[in-house]
Amino acid sequence: MMHSDKYIQALIDSQPFFEVNQENVLGVEMDVFKNRPRSLVDFIELSASHGEKPYLIYQDKVISFDQHLTLVKKAAHILQSQHNVKPGDRVAIYAANCPEWIIFFWATVSIGAIACGLNGWWKGSEAIKAIDAADPNVIVSDQKRFDRIADQVKHPTLIFEDLDLSLYEQELNSFIRIDEDECACLLYTSGTTGTPKGVMTSHRSMIANSTLQMLQGAAVSQHSSSHGIDWSKNTPTSLLTSPLFHVSGLSAGAVTSLFAGSTTLVYDGRFLADKVIKLIQKFSVTSWGG
């Protein structure tokens, strides 16, 4: 990235969106993006401008930004009306990477609640420890992972395979904004030194990470253009192979793609190099992080 430093500084100096100044953040003076969104709700609302452009591609399913926004509103209504989820409450997500994982993440933060991304590789007993500690209003899960906890779980659970959001008629009337330094999600450590711990991640943190990635991407694009490489011919498409319960899959992947208006190709199943290469070629993938 060192070769792009001058392009990064030029963008900071010339583009209001990337302007940086100092602010007091919880008692500490820090460099921040001056004109940043103040809530992940802004990401959701801004996504409407991308209309019918694909946001998520998963197996043979394509979900546009418009469709995603509608599904998020439906999921948020379910959380509010059926499970009394309020700002600060927790919603646990225990599933493999899939569109529903992403939809319920956005639905959760859109009403000021906290998404708890449980490690999808955990055994049932490990998941139960995290669930009991977080005490969510509801768990959303795929069938495979619910089966691991079915005989122990005490919390209400929504199973993705039993839930067809497209058939649900009611939608959230209005999103709920909370302070940018409030928690948006809990992601868990690996547990190499003991029991995995939930790490609080704020709206501010996720917004800053996404904005920084967009800045770096713009700088790399300008650097490439100066060497005769034109990326503008390809539709921005990212390949998501990292788990959504990890910051690389969620914040760097799905969240940034929504903000940037890029298409996210959600990989499913065990990582197979040949399969990945074919997907990259088929969908003309322009970015892949891990």
Question: How should each PLM-predicted stretch be described?
Answer:
Residues 32-36, 41, 52-86, 92-106, ...:
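Conserved AMP-binding/adenylate-forming core of the ANL superfamily
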Residues 207-240, 245-287:
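Conserved AMP-binding/adenylation subdomain of ANL enzymes
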Residues 76, 89-90, 96-124, 133-138, ...:
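A short helix-loop-beta submotif of the ANL/AMP-binding
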Residues 64-66, 184-215, 220:
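Conserved AMP-binding A3 loop
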Residues 96, 141-148, 242, 282-290:
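Adenylate-forming
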Residues 1-15, 106, 110-177:
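Structural core segment of the AMP-binding/adenylate-forming
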Residues 1-37:
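Flexible, non-catalytic linker and terminal segments flanking ANL/adenylate-forming cores
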Residues 52, 171-188, 194-195, 225, ...:
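Conserved pre-ATP/AMP-binding loop-to-beta segment of ANL
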